[in-house]
Amino acid sequence: MPKRSSPICCRLSFATLLLLLMTQPAMTQESKSVTLELDHVSICGSNLDTLRRIFTDAGMTPDYGGPHGNGVTQMAIIGFDDASYVELIAPIKPGVTAGSGWAKFMAEDVVPCAWAVGTNVLLQEVDRLKKAGIPVKPPERGSRKRPDGMSVEWMTADLGSGTPGSTLPFIIEDQTPRDWRVQTSAGVKGAPVSGVENVVLGVNNLDASIALFRKAYGWAEPITETQKDFGKLAYFPGEPVILAAPFNGGWLSDRLGKFGEVPVAYLLATRDFAAATKKYKLNGMRTWFGQKVAWFDAGKLKGVRLGVIGQ
């Protein structure tokens, strides 16, 4: 997916234009592989105050973000230095979730529910995915009213047939400046974590899911390994998604049975693993694809698997 950037106007000389035309086949070949830009991940719950308290107790105080334009949900945000963020979503009125694509998740206390990737050419990306044979729902406008009264607006497009951002990510394009939507939260300024690095996506059939992502984004074969607590993993180097398929039952199998294929864990980036481990009292250190991974106390996070990855 193309990186968001400011438009740049320029003039091309005839020679430059000719060179571009001559190299177009090579450029087209290279563009077949799409790099995703992770925008944000979502955690749903039945009560926003409860969600905020859970993450505050874990050492990352969320900022209240305001109600969404659908009149059904509201959110809080943990914004990181790299402009990615964790979104906490809950109904405005307790138990009233009709009209939200994540209604079934908001019946729970706290559960990972979606992931999104960003673009500044949403319609182009929708067209590309359709040509690749990926089902895409018509783009929709969305908005949120911040506590200061400012309206934040965007466009989204959902992929596949599940809930938004369940297996393939939903796509989001800002219609207002991005820094209206996310800024680094005071609760993580100067913290040893800098953003959301990976989404761990629970899947039933690893081979089928690998094929789906390769079809959508033109990626090469992933690296695979097995982790006792998750099952068999597949990682596409340089991309933000790790696929996880269970074996011999376990919590991941149970979760897939209840919610289907959705995110099951999120990993935050760090350049100082020791400092992150100390600050957040991480545990269960393992090595995933050559990187250290350790976890927040899942009990304190009411079952949410949130980890840190790095060196």
What spans do the regions from the language model cover?
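Bacterial N-terminal signal peptides that target proteins for export
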Residues: 2-14
